[in-house]
Swiss-Prot record:
Fe cation binds at H60, H64, C127. Homodimer. The gene is luxS. GO terms for biological process: quorum sensing. Binds 1 Fe cation per subunit. It comes from the Bacteria. Involved in the synthesis of autoinducer 2 (AI-2) which is secreted by bacteria and is used to communicate both the cell density and the metabolic potential of the environment. The regulation of gene expression in response to changes in cell density is called quorum sensing. Catalyzes the transformation of S-ribosylhomocysteine (RHC) to homocysteine (HC) and 4,5-dihydroxy-2,3-pentadione (DPD). Keywords: Autoinducer synthesis, Iron, Lyase, Metal-binding, Quorum sensing. Its EC number is 4.4.1.21. It comes from Helicobacter acinonychis (strain Sheeba). This is S-ribosylhomocysteine lyase. It catalyses: S-(5-deoxy-D-ribos-5-yl)-L-homocysteine = (S)-4,5-dihydroxypentane-2,3-dione + L-homocysteine. InterPro entries: LuxS_sf (IPR037005), Metalloenz_LuxS/M16 (IPR011249), S-ribosylhomocysteinase (IPR003815).
């Protein structure tokens, strides 16, 4: 078993979660493909690690909303995935490396979440846990995240 000081294969396992200050958006990883494609993964942290977390229905609904809406603002988005610790999401993009633009896209997306009238694909045909959604909860998360927009670049460390 590896100790806390041993370098791990997973980038986020090497992040000292006691030294970050949520909410924030940070570049978690960059990978170059053999043909020159660039994959950039962002750590989009909503809650302070080990102190608070998102409840599952709200997180689940925000996942659906952002996954659908963000693509209206950026065609380079590959994925928007929740973290198992329920403190944030990973945003993965292809051939795009402009941090400032990512912040703008996230801001526009969260503003659109606040205007949403339903959670997309929140039915049994399109979702594996359709009963586990709350539009109000997702909007509350988006509102809280947006209210600290000026802090997104302040990671702590």
């Amino acid at each position: 078993m590896k100790t806390p000081n041993t370098k791990m294969n997973v980038e986020s396992f090497n992040l000292d979660h006691t030294k970050v200050k949520a909410p924030y958006v940070r570049i978690a990883d960059r990978k170059k493909g053999i043909n020159g494609d660039l994959i950039v993964k962002y750590d989009v942290r909503f809650k302070q690690p080990n102190q608070e977390h998102m409840d599952m229905p709200s997180l689940h609904s925000l996942e659906h909303l952002v996954a659908e809406i963000i693509r209206n603002h950026a065609n380079y988005v590959v994925d928007w995935s929740p973290m198992g610790c329920q403190t944030g999401f990973y945003l993965t993009v292809l051939n795009h490396d402009n941090y400032t633009e990512i912040l703008e896209v996230l801001e526009k997306t969260m503003q659109d979440v606040l205007k949403a009238t339903e959670v997309p694909a929140s039915n049994e045909k399109q979702c594996g846990w359709a009963a586990n959604h709350t539009l109000e909860g997702a909007k509350n998360l988006a509102h809280a995240f947006l209210s600290k927009r000026d802090e997104w670049s302040e990671i702590g460390i």
